[in-house]
Amino acid sequence: MKKIGRGIGLSFYGTGYGNGFPDVSKARVRLLEGGKVGIYVGGTEVGQGAKTVLTQIGAETLKMPVEDIVFVHEDTVHMPDAGTAAASRQTYNTGNAIRVACENFRNKLKELAREHLALNSIYGLKVENGKIYLDFFPQKSLSFEELFEKSSKGDIEAEGEFVAQTVMMEEETGQGAPYWPYTFNACGVELEVDTLTGLVEIRKAVFAQDVGRAINPHLVEGQMDGGFAMALGYVLFEDLNLKEGKINNNKFSKYLIPTAMDTLEIEKIIVEDPESTAPYGAKGIGEPTMIPVGPAILNAIYDAIGVRITELPVTPERLVKAIQEHEKEKGEVK
Amino acid sequence: MKKISLNVNGKDHILEVEEDMRLIDLLREKLGLTGVKEGCSEGECGACTVIMDGEVVNSCLVMAFQAEGSSILTIEGLGDEENIHPIQQAFIDVGAVQCGYCTPGMILAAKALLDKNPNPTEEEIREAISGNLCRCTGYNKIVQAIDRAKEVLR
Amino acid sequence: MKLEVVGKNILRIDALSKVTGRALYPEDFYMEGMVYGKTLRSKVPHAYIKVDTSRAEKIDGVIKIFTHKDVPNNKHGVVFKDHEVFCSEKVRRIGDPIAFVVAKDRKTCELALENILVEYEEIEGVFDPIEAMKDDAPKVHGDSNIVYHFKIRKGDVEEGFKNSHVIVENTYKTHMVDHAFLQPEAGLSFIDEEGRITVIVATQYPHYDREEIASALKIAEDKVRLINANIGGAFGGREDISLQIHLALAAHELKMPVKVVYSREESFLAHSKRHPLIMKYKTGADKDGKLLALEAEIIGDTGAYASWATNVLRKSGVHATGPYFIPNVKVDSYAVYTNNPYAGAMRGFGATQVPIAHEQQMDMLAEKLGMDPITIRLKNMFKKGSVTATGQVLTESVPLQECLERVVEKMDFPVGEKEAY
């Protein structure tokens, strides 16, 4: 018999290394030939979109197009340490370091422009679209390209650093401020359980994710789709089949991850509530996007068949067995 | 060693291959076509997908000598920066790329689908790429990209 | 604030290179004079070992076989230095690295691996974390398998349960899973034009890898260079060291480019896994559905090595309440060594597991109270100004209620009715 159920899951997630451990990101910004700007940072692009998002933060701070920014993050010889691409920390932590570095860079450009334009102070100078100019007398203007030519090539640079704030917890009570900031979300699913085969099919899903502010909404959606799929695999079928320390499912013909046939278009809602300590309000969402999905599925399974599943994964065999036991128990009660 | 001739991305090649060499090794190591990716070596993940005589194959499961006389398309032959293919463009525009490791195989699976069925439904698209695993995207933007490419190509 | 770039769907900067197949991942790099490396790994979960490489060394084309004797400082690890670069006396899990063969090609590497003689003196293993916590359990490292114990003590849970109208108690179990990123580990090492040991890999944290390589080889960090190629997914599985030190050691000793590409099967052995948790939950609420107390005991199996176990189980503990205000909380979370594959970071890092428990507890409490699942959450959820179980004040950006309300609206969940969903 096919039974339909619905369920919800909520979660919160503290980002960053946390617990008072120094969480430091550093970035360097340099003027390049042709008036381009290089951002040098050890933040890794693992596929999540760090390269794009961090470039956007730099471009926003310098008020210039992303095309004119060269993002260098591959080689330890050229880039300062920006911490790990983990703990959902790159957008917030390294994004902040880049914003600070770009602000310092902007001030440096103003100082240099003041000299070259023979001005008395930097007040009224604006940095925008690859040039430094006096707001109320725009004829006083110097392009990034001209400034590069006037400098001894490549020595105009600035650095920035961001150190996140957390408080180590007390050992006996756990009292402290272990993470900052926290990200929140909610996921609702509707699914169908085939009580004979134990197969679970998701029919509908709605996923609302707090992001502080979305630097790039498409990339946020990509994380939500990906997190949903990973959670689906986690709860319903991924299994190493571990026996006495041996991974028996050690290849993709045995360790099954979701395919395009297992996933579905989900309704994604991006909730914005900017965080004041974050770069343009943006919080990390890489990990959170997987978290509320699993419990929503489990609650929906209960709603469908009245059986609580307390052990993962909910494979068809385990589900059929649980249904049979439940029926037996009900029979005994009667 | 065996001598084989085949056409890859429009170019004819005559190559000496070992008996136990796989097509993926020939493409990657003899011809430098590293857009062909290896994810599982057992035909499950589809990262090594190429189009051989119009059919999608996992190049890790095809022996090099079996490609004798065939015509093969890899991602490098589909389009490049100057001459990008509409499916590639759709993947960029829709945001269907994350880590990018499944992307070449995914795009070629889409190409083979659209060559045969220019107007697939969402279900048909999902089925056509179900032999290509992706761990990042949850597939939805990939499906959307193929759907968009189909409109452009029609 | 007027924003011009932030908030825009700027096209992914690395997309063009990825759709054209030009993006290079570590296995896509080839160099003149390049040789290959392959790792010998333990076939048993717990044993003392003796290794004899002499027969393999005589094979034509074998350049060198590295073992623990060749590593100046044979230790590494993200928090505790409990991993050995190559096991010296004991293997603690199936897949532990024992030796690294460098040979002229891959086939010779395979042949050499078959000819390395490993004598395993097997010892009893422990695979269940609850068993592993007992005093008489076989010890994986040192004299206790308990790596870490995290505690939260807030209010008085006994009092909280006494005042509760409903109490729900359950034990939940999650399992060990793999990141299954699509690109198996690979890398290429060489000495660059300035004499630096250079390693091209796919890593989440290049500066950390550099630090570990420098430490293992006992050389200065500026003599080591990490180049991060394109990365075929990570999800936490590329935080610990896998092949980085092996590659660096080989290039350093041999002064020739060395390449390693893992198979999918080896990838499963090489990197960390998600911690399986056993979560014992007791949650109480008053008759209006207000949560009064939570007591949770969480036991995490970190397998043969600690990796991020302390931080993961800490994160489980801190997130054990779920996003709800609870006045009385007692949490104990433990990380425990076993002879299973080692667990480390994976997307959500201990916070992915606990909602499997707390969200089902919420639904069960609601059912007992004859309340719907949305209402009980609305009554207890974090809002701006809420205080967490660790005493942290959530001063801003807490739009959980909005998240819930928008999902409720789109799912058309009934609210305020005595039924689930």
Regions found by a protein language model. Give the residues of each.
Chain A
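Cofactor-binding beta-sheet edge motifs in enzyme active sites
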Residues: M1-K334
